[in-house]
Design a protein with these regions (language model features):
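Generic recognition of flexible, low-complexity loop/linker segments
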Residues: 1-2, 42
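Extended substrate/RNA-proximal surfaces in nucleic-acid metabolism proteins
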Residues: 2-4, 10, 66-112
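Extended charged low-complexity segments that act as oligomerization/scaffolding linkers
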Residues: 9-11, 28-30, 38-45, 60, ...
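Histidine-centered catalytic micro-motifs
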Residues: 11-22, 58
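Hydrophobic faces of well-ordered beta-strands that scaffold small-molecule active sites
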Residues: 13-15, 53-55, 78-82
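Acidic/histidine-rich helix-loop elements
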Residues: 19-35
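Active-site-proximal flexible loops/turns
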Residues: 23-25, 64, 90
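Divalent metal-dependent hydrolysis catalytic cores, especially in the metallo-beta-lactamase
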Residues: 41-58, 83
């Protein structure tokens, strides 16, 4: 998305997409490889003309780079992030700029 837009522009988005590792958070085992899993949301994005998605897992950012490497070459912008929960069981999805590195996300998580 390197074009400069001078008027309102809307993109179809998929928000809070979970990475392959999400099932481990739920205590389940993933039957697909990470690459196989990442190709499923890629195909869904292509089928539905989705141009933007965010990737968020519970306190884990390990799957960010792998899904970016699949989505970005196809012109799909990925906002990386993570989900956190409070002691009151409120959940927050924290999203960051598309250029935020996995290391920076880990620093944010470590500061919480």
């Amino acid at each position: 998305m390197s074009k400069i837009y001078t008027k309102a522009q809307f993109w179809k988005c998929a928000l809070q997409v979970n990475p392959a590792s999400y099932l481990a958070y739920r205590g389940q085992e993933q039957s697909l490889t990470e690459d196989e899993y990442n190709r499923l949301p890629l195909q869904a994005c292509k089928d539905e003309n989705i141009k933007v998605l965010d990737i968020a897992d519970h306190g884990n950012v390990d799957g960010i780079d792998a899904i970016r490497n699949v989505m970005n070459p196809e012109g799909i912008l990925v906002f990386p992030g993570f989900e956190i929960a409070t002691t009151e069981k409120a959940h927050f999805v924290c999203l960051f700029s598309e250029n935020t590195s996995k290391d920076q996300l880990n620093r944010y998580l470590g500061a919480l």
